[in-house]
């Protein structure tokens, strides 16, 4: 019996113990001195294997009980001990690697939307089926095939639209009275550049993506085409009605959308009138629809509203000399106009075209004129070749061609590129018919104007309101 016990003890490799139960009790639940902890996750656990020396405290506890009992009991204990599972080794939890790319937008917006949608599949806009004689397009196989062929075209538009939505929703939350217009405009423009991934400081970069045109911040009676020039100190006031109109583009696919901000609920009926008119225009637009029919529907919706200001009721009037327009690649104003009043234009919308449906309402005369300092400019597509005598004009034209092409720009954009003393050359390009200037457009002073706008795509099968969002 004693020999059997001795053999069992040798099998357990206990010859390193000193025989003092008290001194060895400290090793219960510990590894032997000098034995490193094993973090391998691959080692198999075997429930039928006796614990190795130093593998854990269980073996030591049973061993020291053996020296205090008769041999028969000791052998029984050894038999029991052989069935105890080996002490579990401490496993180190492996840290999961974080996947690259942010999953949410930052505040202020600075994460490119391509990081948020790594598969380059961007949310589609509002899908509206065609009606009347075009209702067949939704299920027509030939049209569906044509629609599938345009996937890259659609994804570029949808990416630009997602940029616009994220930037404007941040702007709506953060713009407050007391901010300068320069601060507001640059905040929006910086966000668009960051989210498209194109800062526009290197030659040609702005042609790949970024601002589709300068951020317009037209106040009160000014309806359109106002953005601050360098040195502008104008501050947004509590009683102001501000139109925020900006574009984002990817590879020249421009998404043009605008909204109006107020900080006094007295202007709500004015905003409701214009929003209703814009949505009416979107609803009526479609393949083979005549422009005159769209304008008549818009006017009827707009002019059914009135607004009370300081105890006086004002009818909301369409600004009759402002229009929506089609959008071509890298060209914000194509050759077609979408009127917002009844007229005789028999031009039709066509399959594959992109339109900016925008409406303007006013408490004034409903007619705008050029006023105030010009800030918006654009190279005229296919402008005739004209000899330029001013070297400053030649140099500036080169800068415009390489950085903007036919995309609109403003003076602040030239400042940002490091251009200096360019005004004389810029005016020479305008007078030569190479560059078009776009002065601010204003109704009578004391009146209030509002604007809402969306970009729509006339796809072969459906109409997609590409810039639609939860906000408007």
Curated annotation (Swiss-Prot):
Residues 86-101 have a biased composition (Basic residues). GO terms for molecular function: aminopeptidase activity; initiator methionyl aminopeptidase activity; metal ion binding; metalloaminopeptidase activity; metalloexopeptidase activity. CDD domains: MetAP2 (cd01088). Substrate binds at residues 225, 333. It comes from the Eukaryota. Binds 2 divalent metal cations per subunit. Has a high-affinity and a low affinity metal-binding site. The true nature of the physiological cofactor is under debate. The enzyme is active with cobalt, zinc, manganese or divalent iron ions. Most likely, methionine aminopeptidases function as mononuclear Fe(2+)-metalloproteases under physiological conditions, and the catalytically relevant metal-binding site has been assigned to the histidine-containing high-affinity site. Its main location: cytoplasm. InterPro entries: Creatinase/aminopeptidase-like, Met_Aminopeptidase_Type2, Pept_M24, Pept_M24_MAP, Pept_M24A_MAP2, Pept_M24A_MAP2_BS, WH-like_DNA-bd_sf, WH_DNA-bd_sf. It is found in: Cytoplasm. The keyword Nucleotide-binding does not apply. Pfam families: Peptidase_M24. Its cofactor is Co(2+); Zn(2+); Mn(2+); Fe(2+). GO terms for biological process: proteolysis. Its EC number is 3.4.11.18. A divalent metal cation 1 binds at residues 245, 256, 453. It catalyses: Release of N-terminal amino acids, preferentially methionine, from peptides and arylamides. A divalent metal cation 2 binds at residues 256, 325, 358, 453. Residues 14-53, 86-119 are annotated as: Disordered. Belongs to the peptidase M24A family. Methionine aminopeptidase eukaryotic type 2 subfamily. Cotranslationally removes the N-terminal methionine from nascent proteins. The N-terminal methionine is often cleaved when the second residue in the primary sequence is small and uncharged (Met-Ala-, Cys, Gly, Pro, Ser, Thr, or Val). This is Methionine aminopeptidase 2-3.
């Amino acid at each position: 019996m004693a020999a059997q016990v001795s053999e069992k003890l040798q099998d357990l490799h206990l010859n390193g113990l000193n025989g003092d139960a008290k001194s060895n009790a400290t090793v219960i639940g510990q590894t032997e001195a000098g034995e490193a902890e094993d973090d391998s996750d691959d080692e198999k656990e075997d429930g039928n294997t006796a614990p190795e020396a130093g593998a854990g405290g269980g073996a030591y506890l049973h061993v020291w009980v053996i020296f205090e009992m008769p041999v028969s009991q000791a052998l029984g204990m050894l038999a029991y001990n052989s069935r105890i599972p080996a002490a579990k080794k401490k496993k180190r939890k492996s840290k999961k690697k974080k996947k690259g790319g942010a999953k949410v937008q930052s505040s202020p917006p600075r994460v490119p939307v391509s990081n948020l949608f790594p598969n380059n599949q961007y949310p589609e806009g509002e899908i509206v089926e065609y009606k009347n004689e075009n209702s067949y397009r939704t299920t027509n196989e030939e049209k569906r095939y044509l629609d599938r062929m345009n996937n890259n075209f659609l994804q570029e538009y949808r990416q630009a639209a997602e940029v616009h939505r994220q930037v404007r929703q941040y702007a709506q939350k953060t713009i407050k009275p007391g901010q300068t217009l320069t601060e507001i405009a640059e905040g929006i423009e910086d966000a668009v550049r960051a989210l498209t991934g194109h800062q526009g400081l290197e030659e040609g970069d702005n042609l790949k993506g970024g601002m589709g045109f300068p951020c317009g911040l037209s106040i009160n009676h000014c309806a359109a085409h106002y953005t601050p020039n360098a040195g502008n100190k104008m501050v947004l006031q509590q009683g102001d009605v501000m139109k925020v109109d900006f574009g984002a583009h990817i590879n020249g696919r421009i998404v043009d959308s605008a909204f109006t901000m107020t900080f006094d609920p007295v202007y709500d009926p004015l905003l409701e009138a214009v929003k209703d008119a814009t949505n009416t225009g979107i609803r009526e637009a479609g393949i083979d629809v005549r422009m005159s029919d769209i304008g008549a529907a818009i006017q009827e919706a707009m002019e059914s509203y009135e607004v009370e200001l300081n105890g006086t009721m004002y009818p909301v009037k369409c600004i009759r000399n402002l229009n929506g327009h089609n959008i071509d690649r890298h060209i914000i104003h194509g050759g077609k106009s979408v009127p917002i009043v009844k007229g005789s234009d028999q031009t039709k919308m066509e399959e594959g075209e992109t339109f900016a449906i925008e409406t303007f309402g006013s408490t004034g005369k409903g007619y705008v004129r050029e006023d105030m300092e010009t800030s918006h400019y654009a190279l005229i597509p296919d402008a005739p070749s004209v000899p330029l005598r001013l070297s400053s004009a030649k140099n500036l034209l080169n800068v415009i061609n390489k950085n903007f092409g036919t995309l609109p720009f403003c003076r602040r954009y030239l400042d940002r590129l490091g251009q200096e003393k360019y005004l004389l050359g810029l005016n020479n390009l305008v007078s030569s018919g190479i560059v078009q200037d776009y002065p601010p457009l204003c109704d009578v002073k004391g009146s209030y104007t509002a604007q809402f706008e969306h970009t729509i795509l006339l796809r072969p099968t459906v109409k997609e309101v590409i810039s639609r969002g939860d906000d408007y």
